[in-house]
C-alpha cells in the first residue's frame, strides 16, 4: 500500500460521502416527477404517493427524492402563504381563485423527460393531522404541520425517513477512518524500516539491541558527549584524507591494526562494567548478526574478532572504505580509536 493507494481511497471516500449526503434535486425529471433508477425513466409523484392527504399541502420538488433514490425531504409540504389546496391536487393555487384546478405540469428546463409507463394513482389517504385552533389561523380548515407528514408517508412503499440518512453515513465514516489509520500505520512502519541501521542486513532484530547503552554506561557516555566537539573536529580534518581509502588497507598496516585490536576487542569480565563501542557493536553497525559476534569472540585469543570483522566486510563488500569505518567509530564515541586510525594519514 503506497501513497497512490491512499489517494484512491480518499477519492472514493469523498465520492461515497457526496452520494450519501446528496441533497440535490433530480437533474433528469420535472418538478412533479422523480427519477426511477430501475427503469431509467421519470415517474409521476402522484402515481407513487397518491394525492396529498391533508388540505393545503402540495408535493415537494421531485417528491423529496434524489436521483439515487434517497429520500432527502418529505414528499409533501405546506402551501406557501396566500396559496391553498383544499381538493388535494398536486400543487397549491392562489386562495382568491376559488376552487383550485388541477395545475399544469411544471417543466424544468435542461432536464430529460423520458416518461415511464403510467400506473394507477393510489387512493387518497386519510389526513393524520388535526385542525388547528380556529383562532390560530385566518383560513378555516388550515392544518398544522406540527405533526409533520412523516406519519402520512411512512406507510408508503419505498419511503425512507431522512433522519435515517446520518445513521447510514456513520458506519461508512468509521470504515473509512479505519482504512486511513491502517494505511498511515503501514507507511509509518515502512519509513522506520527504511532508516539505515534500524535493522541488520540479515534481518536479525537482536542486533539492534547493541546500539543502545546499558544503564551502567551512562556516565561514560556523558564524558564522551562532552568531548563531542573534539571528536567531530578530529573526524573532519585528520581523517579527511582517509575517507576514500579501502578498508583492506588496515589488514596491511599491522601496527595500526594491532592498536585497534587492543582498544576495540576487549570486553569486561564477569565483575566488570558493561562496555560500549567494542568490536561487537562495530559488527552490528556493519549489519552482522549477534550470533556472528558471539562466534568471533569464542575464537579468542587465537584470533582477533576485529580482524575477522574487517576480513568479513572486505570479502562481502570490497568497496568498503576507511571513511565508513571511521564514521561508525565516531557514532560509537571511540575517540581513542579514531586517533589511532588517523596514523594512516
From Swiss-Prot:
Annotated glycosylation sites: 87
Name of protein: IGF-like family receptor 1
Keyword Transmembrane among UniProt keywords: yes
Localisation per UniProt entry: Cell membrane
Residue ranges that the UniProt entry lists as topological domain Extracellular: 21-163
Basic residues biased stretches: 111-121
Biased composition (Polar residues): 136-149
Topology in membrane: Single-pass type I membrane protein
Gene: Igflr1
Function according to Swiss-Prot or TrEMBL: Probable cell membrane receptor for the IGF-like family protein IGFL.
SUPFAM superfamilies: DEATH domain
Entry GO CC: plasma membrane
Amino acid at each position: 500500500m503506497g501513497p497512490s493507494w491512499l489517494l484512491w481511497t480518499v477519492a472514493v471516500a469523498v465520492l461515497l460521502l457526496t452520494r450519501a449526503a446528496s441533497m440535490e434535486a433530480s437533474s433528469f425529471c420535472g418538478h412533479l416527477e422523480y427519477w426511477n433508477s430501475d427503469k431509467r425513466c421519470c415517474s409521476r409523484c402522484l402515481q407513487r404517493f397518491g394525492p396529498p392527504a391533508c388540505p393545503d399541502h402540495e408535493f415537494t420538488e421531485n417528491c423529496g427524492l434524489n436521483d439515487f433514490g434517497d429520500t432527502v425531504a418529505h414528499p409533501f409540504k405546506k402551501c406557501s402563504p396566500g396559496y391553498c389546496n383544499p381538493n388535494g391536487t398536486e400543487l397549491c393555487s392562489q386562495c382568491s381563485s376559488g376552487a383550485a384546478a388541477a395545475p399544469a405540469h411544471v417543466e424544468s428546463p435542461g432536464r430529460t423527460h423520458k416518461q415511464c409507463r403510467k400506473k394507477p394513482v393510489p387512493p387518497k389517504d386519510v389526513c393524520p393531522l388535526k385542525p388547528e385552533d380556529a383562532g390560530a389561523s385566518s383560513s378555516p380548515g388550515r392544518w398544522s404541520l406540527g405533526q409533520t407528514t412523516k406519519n402520512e408517508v411512512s406507510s408508503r412503499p419505498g419511503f425512507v425517513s431522512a433522519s435515517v440518512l446520518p445513521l447510514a453515513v456513520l458506519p461508512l465514516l468509521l470504515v473509512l477512518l479505519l482504512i486511513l489509520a491502517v494505511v498511515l500505520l503501514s507507511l509509518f512502519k515502512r519509513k522506520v524500516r527504511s532508516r539505515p541501521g534500524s535493522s541488520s542486513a540479515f534481518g536479525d532484530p537482536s542486533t539492534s539491541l547493541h546500539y543502545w547503552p546499558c544503564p551502567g554506561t551512562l556516565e561514560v557516555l556523558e564524558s564522551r558527549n562532552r568531548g563531542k566537539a573534539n571528536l567531530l573536529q578530529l573526524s573532519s580534518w585528520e581523517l579527511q584524507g582517509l575517507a576514500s581509502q579501502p578498508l583492506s588497507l588496515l589488514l596491511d598496516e599491522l601496527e595500526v591494526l594491532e592498536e585497534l585490536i587492543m582498544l576495540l576487542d576487549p570486553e569486561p569480565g564477569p565483575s566488570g562494567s558493561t562496555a560500549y563501542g567494542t568490536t561487537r557493536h562495530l559488527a552490528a553497525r556493519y549489519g552482522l548478526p549477534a550470533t556472528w559476534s558471539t562466534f568471533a569472540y569464542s575464537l579468542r585469543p587465537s584470533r582477533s574478532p576485529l580482524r575477522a570483522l574487517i576480513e568479513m566486510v572486505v570479502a562481502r563488500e570490497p568497496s568498503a572504505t576507511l571513511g565508513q569505518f571511521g564514521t561508525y567509530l565516531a557514532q560509537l564515541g571511540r575517540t581513542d580509536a579514531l586517533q589511532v586510525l588517523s596514523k594512516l594519514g
